[in-house]
Amino acid sequence: MASDFAIEARGLSKSFGDLRAVSELELNVPKAEIYGFLGPNGSGKSTTIRMLCGLLTPTAGSATVLGTVVPGDEQSLKPKIGYMTQKFSLFGDLTVYENLKFIAEIYSVPTRDHKRRIEELLSNYDLVKQSKQFAATMSGGQKQRLALACAVLHRPQLLFLDEPTSAVDPQSRRDFWANLFRLAEAGTTIMVSTHYMDEAERCHRLAILDRGVKVADGTPQELQQATGMNVVEVSANDPYAAQSALAGLAEVVSVTQLGIRLRVLIPDHHGDPVDLAERALAGEGITATIRQTPASMEDVFVAVTMRAEACRK
């Protein structure tokens, strides 16, 4: 019976000497969705992707990727997946067209289909004017579009993207995500790692990794509703004094300054968070406007990673 999941991982772990990079990871990635990996550098995102691609052998555990067990028959998996590395890894001394043609030959795309498929990708990814340009001379956004075009040239069922927008401008990031949604709508499953909170919110589902451990997963809405935190926003004439007063409260988990506003996380078992903040600031003679607000993805990330840190102590 065919699975509804493109990826199923059970106890997937990887150690490098004494370093546990990924620990007993459990994953279920539905088909035709964008599944995000959110976490800081060193959290195990890239290591996990490389294990799922068959490029790294797990220390323990296994995964089923598009019906193929890894470790096991990685060779049969390669034609079904695309992989875009974090660092631009195409040939700088080849033109855009030559890079695409080279990838087509690697994946044994029939020669009669080369020209049509490459022209289609040049058009779809706005690279027609750059087709004869050497890849090394392109901007970050152009290189990103070329790398994505190469990754999808052979029409993979599953696409792995390792922090693909880490070196491009905001407009290029938005355009890139528009392309990802079109791919998902056409049936491609996408796993994308990121440390951008706004990108995490665009995913259909995501997992949050911290020190190689999955500390939360679900849809962005599910994660935001399950933080166990109340979030209040404080606008004060003296943000620094307000931050000092609130950060000193035992009930407060986190205080972050955003311009003249403060974003305050308070566990939901402490009662009315607005009243708590008002009393604390009034006691210091600080005048402020305080309102409760929904949790953002950054709030979710702070809450779950702090909870994980507390469990490790």
Region spans (language model):
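Conserved ABC transporter NBD signature motif
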Residues: G61-G72, S76-L77
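Conserved ABC ATPase signature
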Residues: D93, F134-M138
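Conserved ABC ATPase "signature" region
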Residues: K101, E105, P110-Q130
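Hydrophobic anchor residue at the start of the ABC signature
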Residues: L148
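Conserved catalytic motifs of ABC-family nucleotide-binding domains
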Residues: R155
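Catalytic Walker B motif of ABC-type/P-loop ATPase nucleotide-binding domains
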Residues: L159-D162
